[in-house]
């Protein structure tokens, strides 16, 4: 009963953005939070860094560079997703095309928002992130908790609850429905 697309192994193109303390307002400025659905936020992700004042692409912003176009794995700095607890930041990154974000650390709420939106947040040390950023593509194996370049693998930690949800494609509703018979039994006992 998968409610979201399961993540087991994933191979994707990377883009490095090694800034520390990227907050949710930098990910999706509050001026763009007027939508009522989860989609349509991608064009506004990193809006103030991504575009020049005239609206054209900023050629110095890594995700705009030709070698990083189509990247689905973001490798970034420490304390990613800090600031206000807007879930729109996760929606914007997902809508932009990211499936995996590798950082030195995450805001707790942002980390949870990623997992709730079928994105895998991975915490790795700086030397591992710098090594992985040298490659065009890397591979993530969630069941074995590894991130691999062609020549090296790095182990990462993830809470078993989040891992189970992502590997099995379960959102909160799907998890609740797994206990439907127990819930009904309890309700009848009242």
UniProtKB/Swiss-Prot annotation:
Q: In which pathway does it act?
A: Amino-acid biosynthesis; L-leucine biosynthesis; L-leucine from 3-methyl-2-oxobutanoate: step 2/4
Catalytic activity of the protein: (2R,3S)-3-isopropylmalate = (2S)-2-isopropylmalate
What molecular function terms (GO) are annotated for this protein? 3-isopropylmalate dehydratase activity
Name the Gene Ontology biological process terms.
Answer: L-leucine biosynthetic process
Q: Does the keyword Lyase apply?
A: yes
Q: Does the keyword Zinc apply?
A: no
| Superkingdom of origin | Bacteria
Recorded GO cellular component terms are: 3-isopropylmalate dehydratase complex
Q: What InterPro entries does the record point to?
A: 3-IsopropMal_deHydase_ssu, Aconitase/3IPM_dehydase_swvl, AconitaseA/IPMdHydase_ssu_swvl, IPMI_Swivel, LeuD
- Which keywords, in A-to-Z order, does the entry hold? Amino-acid biosynthesis, Branched-chain amino acid biosynthesis, Leucine biosynthesis, Lyase
Name the EC number(s): 4.2.1.33
What's this protein's family per the entry? Belongs to the LeuD family. LeuD type 1 subfamily.
Its biological purpose: Catalyzes the isomerization between 2-isopropylmalate and 3-isopropylmalate, via the formation of 2-isopropylmaleate.
UniProt subunit comment: Heterodimer of LeuC and LeuD.
Identify this protein by name.
3-isopropylmalate dehydratase small subunit
């Amino acid at each position: 009963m998968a409610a979201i697309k399961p993540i087991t192994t994933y191979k994707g193109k990377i883009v490095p953005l090694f800034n520390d303390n990227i907050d949710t307002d930098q990910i999706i400025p509050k001026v763009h939070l007027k939508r009522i659905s989860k989609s349509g936020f991608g064009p506004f992700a990193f809006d103030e860094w991504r575009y020049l004042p005239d609206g054209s692409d900023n050629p110095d912003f890594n995700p705009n560079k030709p070698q990083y176009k189509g990247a689905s794995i973001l490798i970034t700095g420490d304390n990613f997703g800090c600031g206000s607890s807007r879930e729109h930041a996760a929606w914007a990154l997902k809508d932009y095309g990211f499936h995996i974000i590798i950082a030195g650390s995450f805001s707790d709420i942002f980390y949870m928002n990623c997992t709730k939106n079928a994105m895998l947040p991975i915490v790795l040390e700086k030397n591992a992130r710098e090594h992985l950023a040298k490659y065009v593509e890397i591979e993530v194996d969630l069941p074995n908790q590894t991130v691999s370049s062609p020549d090296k693998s790095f182990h990462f930690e993830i809470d078993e609850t989040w891992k189970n949800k992502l590997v099995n494609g379960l959102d909160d509703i799907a998890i609740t429905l797994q206990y439907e018979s127990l819930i009904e039994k309890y309700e009848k006992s009242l």
